[in-house]
Amino acid sequence: MNLIMTILTITVALSLILATVSFWLPQMNPDAEKLSPYECGFDPLGSARLPFSLRFFLVAILFLLFDLEIALLLPLPWGDQLHNPTGTFFWATTVLILLTLGLIYEWTQGGLEWAE
């Protein structure tokens, strides 16, 4: 219990110190030079901020979601060595069903079609 209180005290103190120091640090003042893109000393030819495809962002988020799902289900073969493997497999199946329903919903809403 004493170790937990020590760690908790250090964590709270460090958080308060860092929050206080962040207010004292100089604020960033953006100007035209700081906001302009750097092109090896040449004047910029165009805008450095290109438009980002919202479809690409949606597909990337879906990829990360399903990649995380696979990473969470990788230790599942060792689930039969637990005291209650039925509960583990039940929750894994529930997660798979929910994510499959989400994928079907995205598919029917046209979220996976690339053409605009």
Swiss-Prot record:
It is a multi-pass membrane protein. InterPro entries: NADH_UbQ/plastoQ_OxRdtase_su3, NDAH_ubi_oxred_su3_sf. Its EC number is 7.1.1.2. It holds the Pfam family Oxidored_q4. GO terms for cellular component: mitochondrial membrane; NADH dehydrogenase complex. The keyword Mitochondrion applies. The chain crosses the membrane at residues 3-23, 56-76, 87-107. GO terms for molecular function: NADH dehydrogenase (ubiquinone) activity. Keywords: Electron transport, Membrane, Mitochondrion, NAD, Respiratory chain, Translocase, Transmembrane, Transmembrane helix, Transport, Ubiquinone. It is found in: Mitochondrion membrane. It catalyses: a ubiquinone + NADH + 5 H(+)(in) = a ubiquinol + NAD(+) + 4 H(+)(out). Core subunit of the mitochondrial membrane respiratory chain NADH dehydrogenase (Complex I) that is believed to belong to the minimal assembly required for catalysis. Complex I functions in the transfer of electrons from NADH to the respiratory chain. The immediate electron acceptor for the enzyme is believed to be ubiquinone. Belongs to the complex I subunit 3 family. This is NADH-ubiquinone oxidoreductase chain 3. It comes from Cyprinus carpio. The gene is MT-ND3.
